[in-house]
Swiss-Prot record:
This is Biotin synthase. Binds 1 [4Fe-4S] cluster. The cluster is coordinated with 3 cysteines and an exchangeable S-adenosyl-L-methionine. Pfam families: BATS, Radical_SAM. Keywords: 2Fe-2S, 4Fe-4S, Biotin biosynthesis, Iron, Iron-sulfur, Metal-binding, S-adenosyl-L-methionine, Transferase. It is an enzyme of class 2 (transferase). GO terms for biological process: biotin biosynthetic process. It comes from Pectobacterium atrosepticum (strain SCRI 1043 / ATCC BAA-672) (Erwinia carotovora subsp. atroseptica). Pathway: Cofactor biosynthesis; biotin biosynthesis; biotin from 7,8-diaminononanoate: step 2/2. The keyword Chloroplast does not apply.
Amino acid sequence: MADRIYWTLEQAQDLFNKPFLELMFEAQQIHRQHFDPRQVQVSTLLSIKTGSCPEDCKYCPQSSRYRTGIDTERLMQVEQVLDSARQAKAAGSTRFCMGAAWKNPHERDMPYLEQMVQGVKAMGMETCMTLGMLHHDQAERLASAGLDFYNHNLDTSPEFYGSIITTRTYQERLDTLDKVRGAGIKVCSGGIVGLGETVRDRAGLLVQLANLPTPPESVPINMLVKVKGTPLADNEDVDPFDFIRTIAVARIMMPASYVRLSAGREQMSEQTQAMCFMAGANSIFYGCKLLTTPNPKEDKDLALFLKLGLNPQQTGTEFGDNQQQQRLAEQLINADSEQFYNAAV
């Protein structure tokens, strides 16, 4: 794009330092230039393989290095995953994300992963996976199966990264994103607020994301979910205004990307979530959990949507179509969501 901005750290920090209301106004203006401000993309995330991850990410309850009480589960059978996808679609999701606690996928598991992608695609849903690092041929195989998105977060700035993770380098994360993009899969990549980072680190993360050769189509911004047994369990709470600022700056720096209000929503007030939508967030995960951490139930999300006049994207509804919203509400309330998970990684 001829008019694309390549951001400096100083420019990003200047955005964080703007008066709050000015920042919100700018973010909302930019959001309206690229998106319908009343539509929110809705995804569901399922943990298809839980626990026993060899990585040492200090925030993650699925690491084998920490005692967090997480039950370890092997890779789910394909039909189990497809059953969950059917329920997610019935509950209103348009994208089904599948996450596995691996450093990288094993070759023996690739045929099953391909079948999962093909099966979910056949339902008319978008597909996303987060499986750790990928080799070139693995990315190509997932692309051939029809995978739409691959999630691989950068987590934080390059400077702070080594304080949080030592078993995978920042460059390895960037290399995986490059392989995903090279295979023709859309990129989902973001980070976490509340790791103990500074505002400069938050700015540095967003600079890394915005200055990728092609910015991510989807940018999940997570609030740290503190889990007992992880090294970050006693971190200070994130000030809601600091989190909202991060959403707003992400929207300004990546105007055409979906900015996902991701992990941590269970601990946010409705008012904080509303301000995040005002700041430019236009995607959420919903379901009972995000991987292994709590997430607001679907009926609670829908009630908030109704209060704010928001519509789940691609529901075939016109603005204010209360009958359609009521039908969706009934689907959400009746859906069995116990196996759906909330994504922090």
